[in-house]
């Protein structure tokens, strides 16, 4: 497999050279089942799991028998906190639990490669030199630049932590979700229509992926 190439876009609407996308990351096998499993685990891990209902033993009251056993013509009852009474306990209701699932690192990495491959194949990954020219943050300029890159609604922007100007420029854009390069994950890639990398963030992501691959050998 040969490496892919993408143009590097500048803030003034031009291009400034190209970048190589390693085939091992951006031209991998895209397994829908694997991506689904990883995304499901990621969403499950975000759940608090603090839901709780009271059983009949937890509800206050209901200590005495509501009426005598015989002679009333009604069905016998032992407590007004039985589940079929209003204000009674809940049967088989949700209790606090941990929803997190164990997902091996190699599965997460493979799913992310599959998600990035899918976005590249559909021309939905863009690389930019900088989001705004100079060192002055500008939400207006960042919005205009992103709209020139894509007309789709949801955009994931991947930046380095040091790119403070870009962070401040896109923070208030409702259609833009921003991540640091080492936080890139399958769910956010698939949830966005397009992915925009800064050159620095792309290089940092590729270098980290290569380092992880070497350590795994």
UniProtKB/Swiss-Prot annotation:
The keyword Oxidoreductase does not apply. The keyword Ribosomal protein applies. InterPro entries: Ribosomal_uL4, Ribosomal_uL4-like, Ribosomal_uL4_dom_sf. One of its GO terms (cellular component) is ribonucleoprotein complex. One of its GO terms (biological process) is translation. It holds the Pfam family Ribosomal_L4. Residues 46-103 are annotated as: Disordered. Keywords: Ribonucleoprotein, Ribosomal protein, RNA-binding, rRNA-binding. Part of the 50S ribosomal subunit. One of the primary rRNA binding proteins, this protein initially binds near the 5'-end of the 23S rRNA. It is important during the early stages of 50S assembly. It makes multiple contacts with different domains of the 23S rRNA in the assembled 50S subunit and ribosome. Forms part of the polypeptide exit tunnel. Belongs to the universal ribosomal protein uL4 family. PANTHER family: 50S RIBOSOMAL PROTEIN L4, LARGE RIBOSOMAL SUBUNIT PROTEIN UL4M. This is Large ribosomal subunit protein uL4. It comes from Corynebacterium jeikeium (strain K411). The gene is rplD.
